[in-house]
Amino acid sequence: MPIITSLITLSNTTATEIVGGDNMPHQVTLHNTTKSSNEYVHIGPADMTLANSIHLDPGQTIQITLRPGDVLYGMSDPNGLEVGILDIQNND
């Protein structure tokens, strides 16, 4: 099982791909690395905006399962926040 870690800086105007698609389901852990109040990492599909997405509170960590072909995008409010990612992929 490949394990991929990354730290991605996000924009508040453009959705950034944070987890690419795979041909197998995979477990993804996301962490909003900021500790300051009212600074949120938003996640969603490619056409996401800050108004139509779910957010991670400062310091929050979540785990989700992505299905084959799913791609996850992120944005931040304010601009320039970082999201930590741990992607545990399954072998074919």
Locate each region found by the language model:
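Surface-exposed ligand/attachment interfaces on beta-rich extracellular proteins
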Residues: P2-N23
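A short, compositionally biased N-terminal segment around positions ~18-40 that is enriched
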Residues: G20-K35
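Noncatalytic modules at the cell exterior or secretory-pathway interfaces
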Residues: H26-V28, L66-G80
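Short, surface-exposed beta-strand/strand-loop-strand elements in extracellular ectodomains
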Residues: H31-N52
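Edge beta-strands of jelly-roll/beta-sandwich modules across compartments, strongly enriched
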Residues: E39-I43, P78-I88
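Beta-sandwich interaction modules
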Residues: D57-G69
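Short acidic DE-rich linear segments
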Residues: N91-D92
